[in-house]
Each structure stands twice: as C-alpha cells, then as structure tokens.
A protein has these predicted regions:
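Positively charged n-region of N-terminal signal peptides that target proteins for export
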Residues: 1-4
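Hydrophobic h-region of N-terminal signal peptides that target proteins for export
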Residues: 8-17
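Immediate post-signal-peptide N-terminus of mature secreted/exported proteins
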Residues: 17-51
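Amphipathic, charged alpha-helical scaffolds that flank and support histidine-based chemistry
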Residues: 38-49, 84-108
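Short, solvent-exposed, charged loop/turn and helix-capping segments
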Residues: 60-78
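Inter-heme linker and motif-flanking segments adjacent to c-type heme-binding CXXCH motifs
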Residues: 96, 118-125
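The canonical Cys-X-X-Cys-His
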Residues: 108-119
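Short cysteine/histidine-rich metal-coordination sites, predominantly Zn2+-binding motifs
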Residues: 126-131
C-alpha cells in the first residue's frame, strides 16, 4: 500500500505545478494544511501527521515547478528542507512528541518565509505574484 501511495504522489508531481496558477493552488493547499497544524495544540496526533504528510507531497510538487523555471536553486533547496521538516513533523506528531513537532513546524515555516521573501511580490490588490 505504501508503494502505491508514493507512486501516486510521484505521478502527481508531474501533473501539478506546471504554471503559475497551478502553483498558486498548491500554495493555497499548503496553507490550508498548515492552518490545521497551526490551530492544533499540542501539535501532535493523526490530524497533524496527515496534514504534515500532505505538505511534504506539496513540497515535492513545488520543487518540480521551480526546477522548470530555471535559476531557482534556492527555491528548490527550500522545497527539500520544507519536505524534510514536514516529514519530521509527521513523525513527531505520530509519536506524540510535542516539542519535536513544534520545532519541526517552526523549521517548516522558515522555509516558507525564505522562499516567499525571494520569489513572491505582493500586489496592490493584496494578491501575490510569483517573481
């Protein structure tokens, strides 16, 4: 079953994030799942773990998007680091380790901020544009 899930995720990586609109949808999906985690106190349990695992897949999809744009090694690095943090968070949430889960969530947020600061512009209407 695990092989099927990872195979399905690998197929999705090639399907999603082909253009800016698809990428923005991915980021909204990531934001929704991050919101589930942000509201959880403590940051443990099956809902937090499931959201973190979904976020890890989104980071893979994000990396595919940035690889196609070229000259975005920093964004691909943040995608890798974000995925790693999301998987750490999922593991800690399953184990009930609130301290590790909180630390991993903070690390994950740092990767989001790093990429947003470099690759996102806020428009006058409050929406964002990918640089």
């Amino acid at each position: 079953m695990k092989r099927f899930v990872f195979a399905a995720a690998a197929v999705c990586v090639g399907v999603f994030a082909q253009d800016d609109a698809s990428y923005q949808k991915l980021m909204k999906d990531l934001g929704r799942e991050s919101g589930v985690i942000r509201k959880a106190d403590p940051k443990t349990g099956p809902d937090v773990a499931a959201s973190a695992e979904k976020i890890a897949v989104v980071y893979d999809q994000s990396k595919t998007f940035w690889a196609k744009r070229g000259n975005t090694e920093d964004a691909m690095k943040w995608s890798d680091e974000g995925k790693e943090a999301a998987l750490e968070l999922a593991s800690a949430a399953k184990a009930g380790d609130a301290a590790k889960a909180g630390s991993a969530f903070a690390k994950m947020g740092g990767t989001c901020k790093g990429c947003h600061d470099m690759h996102r512009d806020k428009l006058p209407d409050g929406t964002y544009k990918i640089k």
